Amino acid sequence: MLKRVAIVLGGLLISAHALANTMVEMKTNLGNIEIELYNNKAPISAKNFESYVKNNFYNGTIFHRVIPNFMIQGGGFETNMKEKATAAPIKNEASNGLANTRGTLAMARTSNPDSATSQFFINVADNNFLNASRTDAGYAVFGKVIKGMDVVDKIANVPTSTYGMHQNVPKQPVKIISVQIKSINTAK
């Protein structure tokens, strides 16, 4: 009997490990943020983000749009507000059952639902109006902050101004120093 229990528990541990999500650490000049990617519920978006991380794309970019009680957006601009060249856009996964709640990470996009590339945002509040519905394609959630929401809140409340055509730009750059994968999902 004990042998059967040990075999079942061993199988469960292997299954749980195979379903584990990728963990990412984002270092900013205001502190660190740890993020869990939802590889199984948002495979396209999570893989896309991981690809940019592996290519060091986010290193040296900024949070270029921050709005208190809404969200912080980054992943596309350098400190001089020069937009970085990206890979091709991905399919919108906003109908994956995940909601834009406080602390979740979602893909930023244009009015075209399938236009997301490298830019992402972290919800600072529950933003249910960003979820997919019958009349709106929504914004795909693909991860969640598991440590460092105090840093996210600090970023969301920095003084902002307008920079050219861009509104809500931090007066002092909020830099993404590096983004690194801490552990990776091995499930196929």
From Swiss-Prot:
Its main location: periplasm. It catalyses: [protein]-peptidylproline (omega=180) = [protein]-peptidylproline (omega=0). The keyword Iron does not apply. GO terms for biological process: protein folding. InterPro entries: Cyclophilin-like_dom_sf, Cyclophilin-type_PPIase_CS, Cyclophilin-type_PPIase_dom, E_coli_cyclophilin_A-like. GO terms for cellular component: periplasmic space. Keywords: Isomerase, Periplasm, Rotamase, Signal. GO terms for molecular function: peptidyl-prolyl cis-trans isomerase activity. Its EC number is 5.2.1.8. Gene3D superfamilies: Cyclophilin-like. The keyword ATP-binding does not apply. Residues 1-20 form the signal peptide. It comes from the Bacteria. This is Peptidyl-prolyl cis-trans isomerase. It comes from Acinetobacter baylyi (strain ATCC 33305 / BD413 / ADP1).
